From Swiss-Prot:
Lineage: Bacteria, Bacillati, Actinomycetota, Actinomycetes, Kitasatosporales
PANTHER family per record: 5-METHYLTETRAHYDROPTEROYLTRIGLUTAMATE--HOMOCYSTEINE METHYLTRANSFERASE (PTHR30519)
Active site: 709 (proton donor)
Name of the featured protein: 5-methyltetrahydropteroyltriglutamate--homocysteine methyltransferase
One Pfam family linked to the record: Meth_synt_2
HAMAP family given in the database record: Meth_synth (MF_00172)
Amino acid sequence: MTAKSAAAAARATVYGYPRQGRGRELKKAIEGYWKGRLDADALRTTATGLRRDTWQQLAEAGIHEVPTGDFSYYDHVLDTSVMVGAIPARHRAAVEADALDGYFAMARGTQDVAPLEMTKWFDTNYHYLVPELGPDTVFSTDSAKQVAELGEALALGLTARPVLVGPVTYLLLAKPAPGVAADFDPLTLLDRLLPVYAEVLADLRAAGAEWVQLDEPALVQDRTPAELNAAERAYRVLGGLTDRPKLLVASYFDRLGDALPVLAEAPVEGLALDFAEGAAANLDALAAVGGLPGKRLVAGVVDGRNIWVNDLEKSLALLGTLLGLADRVDVAASCSLLHVPLDAAAERDIAPQVLRWLAFARQKTAEIVTLAKGLGHGTDAIAAQLAANRADLVSRADSALTRDPAVRSRTAATTDADARRSGPYPERAAAQRARLGLPLLPTTTIGSFPQTAELRTARADLRAGRIDSAGYEERIRAEIGEVISFQEKAGLDVLVHGEAERNDMVQYFAERLTGYLTTQHGWVQSYGTRYVRPPVLAGDISRPEPMTVPWTTYAQSLTDRPVKGMLTGPVTMLAWSFVRDDQPLGETARQVALALRDEVGDLEAAGTSVIQVDEPALRETLPLRAADRPAYLAWATEAFRLTTGGVRPDTQIHTHMCYAEFGDIVQAIDDLDADVISLEAARSHMQVARELAEHAYPREAGPGVYDIHSPRVPGVDETAALLRKGLEAIPAERLWVNPDCGLKTRGWPETRASLENLVAAARTVRAEHAGS
């Protein structure tokens, strides 16, 4: 096909779309089902309606081929485990008794059965349920969900493309099941898994699928020759099947690298590449392999992970260079639109001119359709859209919101000394022990306590004008009083104020920092029914006034025990926001760090002896390729130290991280120079404690001893057993006892019981240690 004919054949498509509905109907229906207010039929009816509405909206917008199978009640990787029959033994009876309840039990656990481990989906803010596999795993085919959802779309008269997690990525994301040797490689199961995928593909073809999309984002990471050989074998086998649809292998989140020639040569009909994150590298690699003759190329030129309007002229130029490199060039976002909010048009509190800088899923869909039209019919066909887009880009570049000379002058004046603590850690630790007087194995929590219906009502009442600020603050003080009282009675050693005033650990600060915008309806799925509203970091950052000091000092006035000051760190402020793309991330991080440094200084001046600067996103924002990591870690750790570098030696700095594998960033954790770090560890059975020990980590650490993402209450013996496992790696004088993460999403009954058990377990193990 010539470049001209390839352009004429261009179509618009997307890989996936937000699941929740305009009013988060899916979240409400699922939680209603969990609480017994909705039955399974009502939940399924809601889900069917949401899928129908999404597909019809996409088709009406001009999307030629809508995705199916990307919808999920909880997680698409968990759906894949169900599809291939990889049900953990401890959950099989529940799944056999009731498939839906068993599905949710795998995701959330029950009082007696632990859930699957949950971790970040590559370097995004979405979480997936980690498959558990072993040498005895027997796969079986269950394509009912995939076939049914395809049938729903086809019944609407739409062209539909089922989306599956590819077999190589599925195995690379898996981990050894409990009781399986830690060095077991799930990829050794590929030959067992491929026949199941073959059956699924045959079922989908029989159901009417012309194309099936197989997502292989794991191939954008650094891969060994053995892993690349597995990818070659997988697609040689699947491509060689006779009873199958056409195959589109999709990669996203970065450049494809060494896997590109493997997939280019595979007997598949199409390849999807990310031209937002890895544009130059993917373009060069495509040219190096001679393009994709006879194949379909889906070009992800619209950024699927950020919310800024696309530079249409720049994207059209890139698309033009791709013509001639494939038999057909289609236009898409760089990844599933799951990672952005649904519709910017729903925002009412953002200035209209600023709103024109933003593109959520609906606007990105329009950009994709516009680009496909421009590619196929020429720029004259989209002249009006190009002119409007050009004006929006100029408006943003010239806006006073984006640049503050005072902020830029302060950032430029920072020195290396600003990012260093006063005194080496051993001296600081001695000063902190003398000041705090804590027992061995001190107990604490990560920060937040349950956000009750009463708290949400108070915020709603304030927004609606039913109460004034004084009335709202009175309610918050009452909640803080209850949280402090409970912690004292439970016997915790270092307390928190509970963050009752905070709707979200990033949004709370974003609302108080100049340069940020917040949304009303910009919800994005984090996991299951947990949705967040990432703020928009649009301009230079500064702090007009203290943000946390009044609440922290009020809490401290209620107790003689130390109360932690609680801040969100600069890297997490960036990672959990939609960040400006017009300057280097390191520069933006320094601006945020300096604003937070002012807050740290004010907390210390007010008498706060323990200050926690949370950085749960440090690991999850790590670039997917090793070559890109040193530069990231350099600015990320510097930003943390710039935040905390001004405190006295006897002020104890804590940090917290969750939901990640930490082995490859232990040196960076060390480089933060925090006095205490708490980490997620319960679901991974203290793996992180072992990783810290292997690195000879010299400071104090609190690997979590209970999983707060499940409603189950761990018993005293279970918690004590995890604590003893932690002691195998970390000396008692440096080990803290804490949950995995904050308690915001939990209910008060399970929170009380779990923390009381945590304190009892700490006392038990403390006594054992004293008697040994």
